[in-house]
């Protein structure tokens, strides 16, 4: 089930024991604690498949403890971290270390991806199979694409041997290295160096040839252009073994948000044109885009309050992911089931997690939210240690009320 409305649920020993209209409250043992969710929607806990955890190395921006608190506030029960920590997650020992720390302090479930190449340098393949055996759910070079096609081909072939997942940040680095925003008349007017939109589809097109050759599982992060949506739609019709996601900025904002040199709207990939934004929504509507992720990228104030071309990329997103996705429901672009599928079932399937669904005898990872509750986004109230959001002051509808992980109430508003 993708959600429950007006039904009861029983949780016992951290598992979903039963759910449905047939449950009579007056017949439930007094040993159960009763929680009133009248007027609320119970959904599977959100699965966020692209998160920068920052620990180890940049704990002043985020820690495993702070990120898990931020996640549960946003209704996220499972999050998948990218490998670009310091040191880089390119060996099993680092995965084991993060998982051990997560078991000690995290409220949510935290999973790792490993880097495709050693130290994210794009040259030498890392210990992929050993990381896979240690729990890595996939392999990515984080915020970089691998420029050398021979290296990428070796990675595809290697990962195929154990049915692993390649995750791509699709940007041709030779076209993006000097740019800081989408290349357009807006970048020209602002006097900022632009990144051409086709830097994204060029890498996707290249990688699709490797998918055709190897049939390796391939996932594309934060799709942002109409051209990429068109290519992915065609590739899926061809039957290629691919999936993709996007993030709220790419269906909520466009390049005009960079006006006045707003560094909090400086993202990677950059915010695109209005036509691109509308194409992302169409991709979500027709199922071309499988999942929605927060793309949570914490940055401290000093890293953002610089001239635009010097400021760091990225925005936090754990605590706004649900509400911004529900805006697609309120604006009649998606129905509630489509929206929740992008946040729960689909990412869980892509990363082979036993979550993202309401099912008997499975972990009670649940999000209880009010679809119509209005609130104003205020980063000063975030649990995240970083406050860099382009949505500061935005009035949204839909708010998480309670979060359960393995049947335990870990957040309540």
Which residue ranges define each predicted feature?
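Histidine/acidic residue-rich metal-binding segments in metalloenzymes
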Residues: 123-292
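Alpha-helix-loop-beta-strand connector modules within alpha/beta enzyme cores
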Residues: 43, 92-109, 157-168, 320, ...
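Metal-associated gating/positioning segment near the N- to mid-region
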Residues: 38-104
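His/Asp/Glu-enriched, well-ordered alpha-helical/loop segment
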Residues: 189-217, 264, 285-292, 297-371
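C-terminal cap of metal-dependent C-N hydrolases
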Residues: 307-310, 363-413
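Divalent metal-coordination and catalytic microenvironments
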Residues: 14, 39, 50, 71, ...
